[in-house]
Structures are given as structure tokens and as C-alpha cells.
Curated annotation (Swiss-Prot):
PROSITE patterns: SWIB_MDM2. Keywords: Acetylation, Chromatin regulator, Coiled coil, Isopeptide bond, Methylation, Neurogenesis, Nucleus, Phosphoprotein, Ubl conjugation. Component of the multiprotein chromatin-remodeling complexes SWI/SNF: SWI/SNF-A (BAF), SWI/SNF-B (PBAF) and related complexes. The canonical complex contains a catalytic subunit (either SMARCA4/BRG1/BAF190A or SMARCA2/BRM/BAF190B), and at least SMARCE1, ACTL6A/BAF53, SMARCC1/BAF155, SMARCC2/BAF170, and SMARCB1/SNF5/BAF47. Other subunits specific to each of the complexes may also be present permitting several possible combinations developmentally and tissue specific. Residues 1-128 are annotated as: Disordered. GO terms for biological process: cellular response to fatty acid; chromatin remodeling; negative regulation of cell differentiation; nervous system development; nucleosome disassembly; positive regulation of cell differentiation; positive regulation of cell population proliferation; positive regulation of double-strand break repair. The modification Asymmetric dimethylarginine is found at residues 68, 88. Residues 104-117 have a biased composition (Low complexity). It is found in: Nucleus. GO terms for molecular function: chromatin binding; molecular adaptor activity; signaling receptor binding. This is SWI/SNF-related matrix-associated actin-dependent regulator of chromatin subfamily D member 1. Residues 168-474 are annotated as: Interaction with SMARCC1 and SMARCC2. One of its GO terms (cellular component) is nBAF complex.
């Protein structure tokens, strides 16, 4: 009958094959269809079949060794008594819960390796909360309160340092300048004419003009900072023009110019040499290289704002302060400014938008005026050692800016802090492990028998979780477990799926299609 129904014959195991075959045959009706449920049990005169506990290397009864069952037949719903059925060994895969299959030892090893990797990954993500001692430890060790106080102080210190770092980063976005005195030295030398009687050749009289300069040392700066801040004289200027007497040197040779370019090499001074044996009046024009660029204001706007030369953002900020102080903002349309009589004269408008201010200011801003120095080049031998000195104000980068940058870029302290944090985390982990061991030993000392029982139950639950096995093997190995109501319906479903599979194979072989 089994061959007629299309089932594969399975070798019986021990004495259970006869009783199992009798129970299966009784469960089928005429034509291979499921018949009325019957009670499964051992054949008369035979004892109950007790299978050993299945393990990783022991297949369940009814399953071919090394084979995996594939879903067969149409999908079936759960038994009538509700819930997902726990189908017994030997049934088709379509009704078998995947979680009931015991994983191979390789799978268990992979799960354990994954757990170790997760622990290592989580260990890298150490947070401030990992430094906190549990309340139980603080109760056991009162001295730990000193550590908690230090931890709270460290938290406040970290917040203060972080706030200061943010303030420094914001400050570095703005130009940090300080005013210094640049002393300019202007001197000249005269070389009189020399005649050579033997060769009949000589040299004409000439003079040489030198323009040099250096920053005056600030008493507040240390010697190291002063050396580090040394700059070339030409780095302070955008251009330098020396205008000589036009009557003496003509319209094509009376100007000596130097302009900064992208490839300019910085120098400590400038030299000009020309022939001549008379005093020469010259004008030195120095154009400072402002960083960021500065502009000279229109005289009317300069009187109104009290600013002569300044950067564009400072000029706009001063104008906004004037508008806010005199309440010139339109009360109904806040994006407009109501010009007073002074602003009307400057901007030639009674009302303008805030967005128009930069454009209107463009026509009122001019390049800054150059520094003009008048000097007389003397050819008198008595004036050769005289040097004219002029002090001008220049803006240089504040030394504090360099210190700010070095503070933000410094990583030595961060590495040391990270090393100490790792030591603290390791110490806290050791303390927590010792706390767990202490509680373990205390529980065992109070009630050894109850503790061992609870511990075994806990280990059993952990083993099931690690091996991903559902069920109770101790109950499943007893025959009484299979006399429950679900067994009859599970057997019927198994054979019904087998019949449907065989029917589909026959229809496919005969070319019959159900319509």
C-alpha cells in the first residue's frame, strides 16, 4: 500500500518498524486519502520505542542521513487546536519548523565567534557611562564616592574645554590682528667722481638711496616670539614708488616702482642708484598691504561714522549701529531703512533696502591713501652718516592666533587622555567582574543546593539560546509525548502532502494538467 501511494520505503529502526507501519496503514482510507484518525501505539506484544536523545551526529527517526527535506505539496495551515504545530520527526519539511533542527557544530562555532566579535566591537565604543560605578559597588565600598566626585569634576572640565575650543574656532574665523610699529630707515651714500690720468677714463659722480625697515620689538613679546615673528620689510607693502626730481632725470626716468606679484621674492630693503652730484628731492610712496583689504570712506560718510579707513564688514557694522541707534528702521517693513537728512545727502535716497547697502557703499569706498615720505638725497660728505627714521602703524597677526592653532591641532594631550580612559575602563570592567564573582559566591554560600539547581536551569536556557534549539529533548524522547492530539493531525498532513507530491509528479509525467 505504501508503494501504491507513492512513498519511499524507509528502513525500520529496531522493533519500531512494524508498529510504525501498522499505525500508518491504519491512518489511510481507500484510494490513498486520509481516513479517520486512529490511535497510534505499539503493536500488541511489543514495548514502547524509546529513542536515544538526538544529537548533532544522530539523525531523527524517519529522516535519511545527510539529506534535507524540501517543501512538498501545497502549504498547510496549523492544526485545528490553534498555534503553530511542533511537527515530529519524519514529517515533510513543509510542516517542519526550521528552529527545531539542531545546528551543526560548525554553526555553533560561528555563532560563538560572532558573539566574540560583537563584544570586541562594543568594547571599542566606550562611553562616559561605562566609567560610572554601579550603585551596589558604591554601597559596598564607601571610598568609591571620591572617584564619583572626580568623575563629575572631569565631566564639568570636559564641557568647559569643549566650549572653549568652540569659542577658539569661532575666533579664528575672524581676523585677529594687533598693531605694531614699523620703523622705516631712509639713508643715502654719495660716490664722488674719480678721474684716471693713465687711462683717461674715470667714474661719474653717483648716489645710492636705501629704504629699509623692521618691526620694533614689543616688550610684551618674548625673545622666542620676536624671532619667530620676524618678517621681511617688503611683506608689509603692496607697492613702493620713489619719485625723483623730474627736472633732473626727465619724464621717463624719474619714477622707480615696485609692485607685488604672485611670484615676488620678499626682501629686507630697496636700493636705488643714479648718477648725480647735486642734492635731489624725492618722494617715497608706500602702499600698505592690508589683509583683509581696507578702504577709505567718503569724507561725508567718514564724518558720520567716525571711521577713516577700515574693512568692508566693519564699515557695514558701523552703519548698522548708526541705523539702530537713531531708530531708522521702518517699523512696518523691517527690511527698509528710512534715511535721515545725513544719509539722504550721502546715499541720495529717502528710503532703501538693507540688501542695497553693500551696493550703495561700493561707490563710497576708495583705495586707502599711500604713506608719503619726503626726503632729500644729500651729496654733502658731512650728511653721509645721517639716517632718517619714520614710524608707521602696521597690523600683524596676533601671536595668540598661532597659540590657538597649536592648541586646536595638538594631539599629544588627547592621546594621553585616551590612554588614561582605557585604563579607567579596564579597571571598571575588572571591578564589575569581581562584583559578579562576589555575588556568585555569596549566593552559593547562602543556599548551595538551590543555587546549583538555579544555575543549571540558567545554563540550560543559555545552551538552548546559543544552539538555537526549540523544545524539550527530555520530554520528546518519551513515547507518551507522541500520544497527544496533535500527532494524529500531523501524520495526516504529512501523508497528504506526500500524496499531492506524487500526484503532481504523475500528472507531469503523463502530461495531464488540472483545469
Amino acid at each position: 500500500m505504501a508503494a501504491r501511494a507513492g512513498f519511499q520505503s524507509v528502513a525500520p529502526s529496531g522493533g519500531a518498524g512494524a508498529s510504525g507501519g501498522a499505525g500508518v496503514a491504519a491512518a489511510l482510507g481507500p484510494g490513498g486519502t486520509p481516513g479517520p484518525p486512529v490511535r497510534m501505539g505499539p503493536a500488541p506484544g511489543q514495548g514502547l520505542y524509546r529513542s536515544p536523545m538526538p544529537g548533532a551526529a544522530y539523525p531523527r527517526p524517519g529522516m535519511l542521513p545527510g539529506s534535507r527535506m524540501t517543501p512538498q505539496g501545497p502549504s498547510m495551515g496549523p492544526p485545528g487546536y490553534g498555534g503553530n504545530p511542533s511537527v515530529r520527526p519524519g514529517l515533510a519539511q513543509s510542516g517542519m519548523d526550521q528552529s527545531r533542527k539542531r545546528p551543526a557544530p560548525q554553526q555553533i562555532q560561528q555563532v560563538q565567534q560572532q558573539a566574540v566579535q560583537n563584544r570586541n566591537h562594543n568594547a571599542k565604543k566606550k562611553k562616559m557611562a561605562d566609567k560610572i560605578l554601579p550603585q551596589r559597588i558604591r554601597e559596598l565600598v564607601p571610598e568609591s564616592q571620591a572617584y564619583m566626585d572626580l568623575l563629575a569634576f572631569e565631566r564639568k572640565l570636559d564641557q568647559t574645554i569643549m566650549r572653549k575650543r568652540l569659542d577658539i574656532q569661532e575666533a579664528l574665523k575672524r581676523p585677529i590682528k594687533q598693531k605694531r610699529k614699523l620703523r622705516i630707515f631712509i639713508s643715502n651714500t654719495f660716490n664722488p667722481a674719480k678721474s684716471d690720468a693713465e687711462d683717461g677714463e674715470g667714474t661719474v659722480a653717483s648716489w645710492e638711496l636705501r629704504v629699509e625697515g623692521r618691526l620694533l620689538e614689543d616688550a610684551a613679546l618674548s625673545k622666542y616670539d620676536a624671532t619667530k615673528q620676524k618678517r621681511k620689510f617688503s611683506s608689509f607693502f603692496k607697492s613702493l614708488v620713489i619719485e625723483l626730481d623730474k627736472d633732473l632725470y626727465g619724464p621717463d626716468n624719474h619714477l622707480v616702482e615696485w609692485h607685488r606679484t604672485a611670484t615676488t621674492q620678499e626682501t629686507d630693503g630697496f636700493q636705488v642708484k643714479r648718477p648725480g652730484d647735486v642734492n635731489v628731492r624725492c618722494t617715497v610712496l608706500l602702499m600698505l598691504d592690508y589683509q583683509p583689504p581696507q578702504f577709505k570712506l567718503d569724507p561725508r560718510l567718514a564724518r558720520l561714522l567716525g571711521i577713516h579707513t577700515q574693512t568692508r564688514p566693519v564699515i557695514i557694522q558701523a552703519l548698522w549701529q548708526y541705523i539702530k541707534t537713531h531708530k531708522l528702521q521702518d517699523p512696518h517693513e523691517r527690511e527698509f531703512v528710512l534715511c535721515d537728512k545725513y544719509l539722504q545727502q550721502i546715499f541720495e535716497s529717502q528710503r532703501m533696502k538693507f540688501s542695497e547697502i553693500p551696493q550703495r557703499l561700493h561707490a563710497l569706498l576708495m583705495p586707502p591713501e599711500p604713506i608719503i615720505i619726503n626726503h632729500v638725497i644729500s651729496v654733502d660728505p658731512n650728511d653721509q652718516k645721517k639716517t632718517a627714521c619714520y614710524d608707521i602703524d602696521v597690523e600683524v597677526d596676533d601671536t595668540l592666533k598661532t597659540q590657538m592653532n597649536s592648541f586646536l591641532l595638538s594631539t599629544a594631550s588627547q592621546q594621553e587622555i585616551a590612554t588614561l580612559d582605557n585604563k579607567i575602563h579596564e579597571t571598571i570592567e575588572t571591578i564589575n567582574q569581581l562584583k559578579t564573582q562576589r555575588e556568585f559566591m555569596l549566593s552559593f554560600a547562602r543556599d548551595p543546593q538551590g543555587f546549583i539547581n538555579d544555575w543549571l536551569q540558567s545554563q540550560c536556557r543559555d545552551l538552548k539560546t546559543m544552539t538555537d534549539v526549540v523544545g524539550n529533548p527530555e520530554e520528546e524522547r518519551r513515547a507518551e509525548f507522541y500520544f497527544q492530539p496533535w500527532a494524529q493531525e500531523a501524520v495526516c498532513r504529512y501523508f497528504y502532502s506526500k500524496v499531492q507530491q506524487r500526484r503532481q509528479e504523475l500528472e507531469q509525467a503523463l502530461g495531464i494538467r488540472n483545469t
